[in-house]
Amino acid sequence: MNKFKNIAVYGGGSFGTSLAALAAQNCSNVTLFLRDEEIAKEILHKKTNIKYLGGIKLPAHLHATTNLSVIKDFELIIIAVPSYAFDDSIKLLKTHGISEDNTLLIATKGFARNPTELFSDRLKTLLPHSSTAFFAGPNLAKELAKNLPASASIASLDIDIANKIANNISSKIFTTNMTSDIVTLQVAGALKNIFAIKSGIDLASEQGENARATLIVDALKEIITLSKVFGGLQKNSDILLEAGVVGDLVLTCYALGSRNTNFGYELGISSDKKKFLQEYKQLVEGREALKLVLDLIKQYDLHMPIISEVASYVMPA
């Protein structure tokens, strides 16, 4: 079976740490690269990341370090940083020697900025000729870290790369599907967080479960609309039914463990929404992506009513 011999994960937050734990289930040489020296020592010696994952025990052989000088030696590098940090992260890794010899798996959701584009397209500028794939699925970080059942989609224009990555992370309890439609998977990964805000708002206003289910249907239509702008869904629409699109969408919209759904719910029940928005300091990827998507709607004259409605709550005039 064709596999990567070693795997690096860049990003020591909840999702990055859980992806490192997932990778370590099938690979004996996995290293988590992060900035916080104290958390790195904690993972090394106690096999926990209390700040982000509570007391969940991580695999015994998982390594952690802040020393980026060795990251270039890893065949597969998983990028798990917030969307706003993507460009700076790739530029930093380039100064430490990563090149087209490394395969990059993007686990960051959202859009690259200035200009607004897909992360896979930004990588063509920042790191030309690199092998690139994208990861998405219904994956709450704490459940991944506990090695509970889950699934994901892996997309790459080179389907052999997607298959090779799948060989490293698939198991009886973590299933994967592969696709060459890297566009649709990225668009869905960015938009689902905005739709989750709407789901939380609907929950707060007691719209009922029928409305929340209808939201999923309408959200898929808007994913299709924007995906086609970027050249997605050229061959068929099968990817819409996979873990990385409808699976991730349903989880993000229905789980109060989702930061975006919880943000929408708290906004919905707030008596002073303007004050709430001003004082809310936690990172909400849907909020970050919203302005970028609104610019795309204007640029391409798109009809995406859910996005527009969320904007009326989150970015009131």
From Swiss-Prot:
SUPFAM superfamilies tied to this protein: 6-phosphogluconate dehydrogenase C-terminal domain-like, NAD(P)-binding Rossmann-fold domains
Chief location bin: cytoplasm
Lipid biosynthesis in keyword set: yes
Alphabetized Gene3D superfamilies for the sequence: N-(1-d-carboxylethyl)-l-norvaline Dehydrogenase, domain 2, NAD(P)-binding Rossmann-like Domain
Main enzyme class: oxidoreductase
Amino acids binding sn-glycerol 3-phosphate: K109, G137, K192, D248, S258, R259, N260
Protein name: Glycerol-3-phosphate dehydrogenase [NAD(P)+]
